[in-house]
Amino acid sequence: MQTAMVVTWTRPIVGREDRALEYGAEVNEYWSQHARQGKCSEPAMFFTEAGNGIWMVTGERDVLMSLHDTEEARMLTLKGELLLENFCLEFYFAGDAAADYMLRYQSALAFI
């Protein structure tokens, strides 16, 4: 099932800006390593002019969940929570899985 692992945040916590930049490089290196092995897409990062950010990788859900459930990835998540305001990590349905979700949602509406 195609999935996107998406991280959002508003800005670095004041006083931790330098460490947040180092953290961004660390996260990209971890996930780029897995992308080179064909386990996920290359990381993509987006910023607004106000500094809000979005970071994501895509891949098969079971593979992304397995990679996210490693000690190194769990530590990266904890660091993100300590360095970035409003840090949020979520898994999204993507590609055909998103279309399938919409069909299931439509079917579920019949019960309301």
Feature locations, PLM:
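Short S/T/G/P-rich N-terminal loop/turn motif that feeds into the first structured element of a domain
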Residues: 1-52, 59-69, 91-112
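Mid-chain, well-packed structural core segment of small domains
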Residues: 57-83
